[in-house]
């Protein structure tokens, strides 16, 4: 169980596309503090985003690197950590940090139809209010595929 910062250097160096899709576990049960905009080490969530997003282009110079925000989930408005951060706070950090490094961002929090914070949608498209079921994965694959096709045009 290693975080993104600890495992990205072990990925295939010949990868054509790198997709960073994280943040929901940090909100749900992560133990790293949020940190400040000045942080650049993996010791805080903000620092880890800067650490990862600044290093990926150097580690994978020929790859397309894209960042996805978390999907909506059940419990997203339950404050987490000492500071009471909500999922949307983690989403904001991911958006802002991807923009800082000029990385393409698919804002699934804003655009995806998989809004598991709605109990009806959660029952139809997820297994547990977070993880997509087969239909949810089909929808998510289409959303990501359309985004990647748009980058290639």
Write out the residue ranges for each language-model feature.
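Alpha-helical cap/lid subdomain in secreted, periplasmic
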Residues: 3-153
